[in-house]
Regions:
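Pyridoxal 5′-phosphate
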Residues: 1-211
């Protein structure tokens, strides 16, 4: 939620711009966008079909030249529906929009190749399949998106060590809001080491044998 909120508030919106996302997404991928209505942003909610699916075709009907971001969950929290990320990303990019993915329900369980899938921004908490603890998580943001989205809470690790001028680092660290929760990340490292030892592809294959 924090990562998505930073993106939503850091984008240079103009009145009349729009963001497209499926209706009834998790609150962490809904509230940050709904808050943009106060800035005159058109928040377009795509209704799921009768089978609770949100297809690329249904999303495409809401995307136009004023769409700046298309956001969706890789796997919906309330139904388990798995989105066709590659096709949705293609739709977003065809309209020069950024593609953001909420990956909390799949990161660590499903291979997520961001470049292959056309994902510009991806965020997830660590406490599900990533074997972390509540309060830890990640925000992936590619170079193109970094040129557009401004930091909203620059912390001590976001810029060069200068007391008189703010010179952001040229990678995703410029979005770091403050001091790390070191105990959480030390614990998370152990979980990530275990995931790497087993392999995400192995985990995914195992899941498919039970679903």
């Amino acid at each position: 939620g924090v990562g998505i909120g930073m993106v939503a508030q850091g984008f240079p919106w103009q009145k009349g711009d729009n963001v497209v996302l499926p209706a009834d997404e998790h609150w962490n991928n809904t509230f940050p966008w709904l808050a943009l209505r106060e800035k005159g942003v058109d928040v377009r909610l795509v209704e799921p079909d009768s089978d609770e699916r949100v297809t690329p075709e249904s999303i495409a009907r809401y995307v136009d030249k004023r769409t700046k971001i298309v956001a969706c969950a890789a796997v919906r929290f309330n139904t388990g529906f798995r989105a066709d990320l590659q096709k949705i990303g293609e739709i977003a990019h065809a309209h020069n929009a950024l593609f953001l993915v909420d990956a909390i329900q799949c990161a660590g369980a499903i291979p997520m190749h961001v470049e292959k899938l056309g994902i510009d921004i991806m965020a997830a908490a660590a406490f599900k399949w990533l074997l972390g603890l509540p309060g830890s998580g990640f925000l992936y943001i590619n170079e193109q998106a970094r040129q557009i989205i401004s930091p909203i809470l620059p912390g001590m690790f976001a810029a060069e060590n200068d007391f008189r001028e703010l010179r952001y680092l040229d990678d995703a660290r410029k979005y770091e809001p403050g001091t790390f929760a070191y105990p959480l990340f030390h614990a998370w490292r152990a979980g990530l080491d275990l995931l790497q030892e087993i392999g995400i592809d192995t985990i995914h294959t195992r899941f498919l044998t039970h679903t």
